């Protein structure tokens, strides 16, 4: 109230005023049958949100006063792009193959400020995830042999800083 952290009793303890957030998700898939036995698929996904308040953190007490004046997740962002190639033509090595290359980028953050303190803490995580997955199947007489490969690279970047808000 008037720029000061204040403790106010909620008249309806079952209602968390201002606890909503917005989010959008977009998904698009493209498929293409190049010829018999060769199938391509592209999967694109995008997700983004507004700040997401953590009211459970705001109800924590330190003595008789709130522990935090602010505690929320910053906007969360996620991008996925995956290309899959499916082969069903018989070769010496396989009868069926499914190979997927994918990238996923994620950014999320956490922001908090202790009650009646003028320092806001920011923690930001950025992840870049690259994957390759290959599955193969070969029939040999009455038997079926399955084998594959799974590889991934995770790049994680975490940063933190404090902001003086006055």
Label every PLM stretch briefly.
Residues 46-50, 103-107, 140-142, 151-157:
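Transmembrane beta-strands of outer-membrane beta-barrel pores
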Residues 25-27, 80-84, 100, 129-135, ...:
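Membrane-embedded beta-strand positions in outer-membrane beta-barrel channels/transporters
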Residues 40-42, 95-101, 143-149:
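Transmembrane beta-strands of outer-membrane beta-barrel proteins
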């Amino acid at each position: 109230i008037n720029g000061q952290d204040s403790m106010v009793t909620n008249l309806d303890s079952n209602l968390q005023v201002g606890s909503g957030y917005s989010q959008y998700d977009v998904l698009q898939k493209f498929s293409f049958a190049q010829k018999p036995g060769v199938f391509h698929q592209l999967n694109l996904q995008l997700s983004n949100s507004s700040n997401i308040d953590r009211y459970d953190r705001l109800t924590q007490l330190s003595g008789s006063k709130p522990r935090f004046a602010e505690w929320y997740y910053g906007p969360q962002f996620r991008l996925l792009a995956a290309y899959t190639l499916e082969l069903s033509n018989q070769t010496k090595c396989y009868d069926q193959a499914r190979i997927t290359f994918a990238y996923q980028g994620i950014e999320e953050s956490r922001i908090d400020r202790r009650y009646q303190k003028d320092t806001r803490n920011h923690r930001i995580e950025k992840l870049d995830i690259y994957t390759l997955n290959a599955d193969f199947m070969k029939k040999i007489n009455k038997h079926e042999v399955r084998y594959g490969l799974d590889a991934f690279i995770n790049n994680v970047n975490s940063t933190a800083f404090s902001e003086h808000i006055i």
